[in-house]
């Protein structure tokens, strides 16, 4: 199953658990979100929802984050948002930050809230994606839109979306260096982190990284093992942690900037899931018995905990650790 198809299944499971329909009541509404900017250093700006800081602090679900990196020649945008409305907001914030052209835009994954806005970019802007993201969007955009409309609601700017895929592709396990003029940005594939096409954007000059969805937000949010691969995901997050200097700042997929040490919460959670599920597998427990045992109440606090932990992450870990 492809990563985005797993994502669909996960959101459907969430709707079942919560007893709600996203079409009527989405986690966040693309018609209502208001984006704001925060300067993280000269030429480095994070864009996130106005209520993101409050939602992150109480374990709520915030809208997609974005950002801008500016060099002497032009700028690079991180993630292009769900629809025309949100894309227009981040482009307006970018124009306030610099009169220089938008040379590049990066999609950290194929998820629509990170990439649907590609079609609204200036024609001269070059889109950077992983090869896996390009292949998925080229083959499955119609299915993806149908899912988004069914579960996130009509009239939220999804209907007009057409594919605009990568001009520059990051190969599996590779990276692309982008020269913005006096500033080189690294677009890195550290390995499987949620979708199999996850890209991390690193500006070494400011020591700021954008992670996309592998890091949803600060504690108490948790990783989503949407396509399984617990062991690989844990390994990738450890690589990211080791890569970052101690004073780095991290802009997550759905929240305000955090520090390097804040990644420990996500790494420690996955490590504990691996430890406890492996013990259950070694004792030949069934999946149902494993879910009942591996409750990990010390990691509660995230509004989606009662779905993401017992219904997604523990079953994904059980499947991964049961492989021959």
Regions found by a protein language model. Give the residues of each.
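Accessory terminal helices/loops
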Residues: 24-26, 242-247, 256-324
């Amino acid at each position: 199953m492809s990563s985005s198809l797993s994502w669909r299944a996960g959101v459907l499971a969430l709707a079942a658990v919560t007893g709600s329909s996203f079409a009527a009541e989405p986690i966040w509404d693309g018609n209502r979100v208001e984006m704001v900017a925060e300067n993280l250093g000269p030429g480095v700006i994070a864009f996130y929802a106005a209520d993101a800081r409050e939602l992150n602090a109480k374990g709520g679900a915030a809208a997609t984050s974005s950002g801008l990196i500016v060099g002497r020649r032009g700028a690079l945008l991180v993630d292009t948002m769900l629809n025309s409305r949100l894309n227009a907001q981040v482009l307006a914030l970018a124009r306030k930050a610099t009169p220089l052209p938008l040379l590049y835009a990066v999609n950290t994954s194929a998820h629509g809230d990170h990439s649907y806005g590609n079609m609204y970019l200036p024609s001269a802007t070059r889109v950077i994606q992983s090869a896996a993201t390009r292949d998925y969007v080229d083959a499955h955009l119609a299915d993806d839109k149908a899912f988004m409309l069914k579960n996130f609601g009509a009239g939220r700017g999804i209907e007009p979306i057409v594919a605009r895929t990568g001009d520059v592709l990051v190969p599996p396990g590779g990276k692309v260096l982008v020269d913005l003029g006096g500033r080189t940005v690294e677009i890195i594939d550290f390995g499987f982190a949620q979708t199999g096409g996850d890209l991390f954007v690193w500006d070494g000059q400011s020591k700021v990284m954008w992670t996309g969805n592998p890091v949803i937000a600060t504690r108490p949010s948790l990783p989503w093992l949407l396509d399984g691969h617990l062991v690989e995901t844990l390994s990738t997050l450890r690589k990211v942690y080791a890569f970052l200097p101690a004073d780095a700042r991290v802009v997550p997929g759905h929240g305000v900037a955090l520090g390097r040490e804040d990644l420990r919460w996500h790494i420690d959670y996955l490590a504990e899931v691996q430890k406890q599920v492996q013990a259950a597998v070694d004792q030949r427990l069934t999946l149902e018995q494993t879910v009942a045992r591996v409750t990990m109440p010390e990691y509660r606090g995230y509004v989606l905990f009662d779905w993401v932990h017992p219904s997604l992450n523990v079953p994904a870990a059980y499947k991964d650790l049961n492989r021959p």
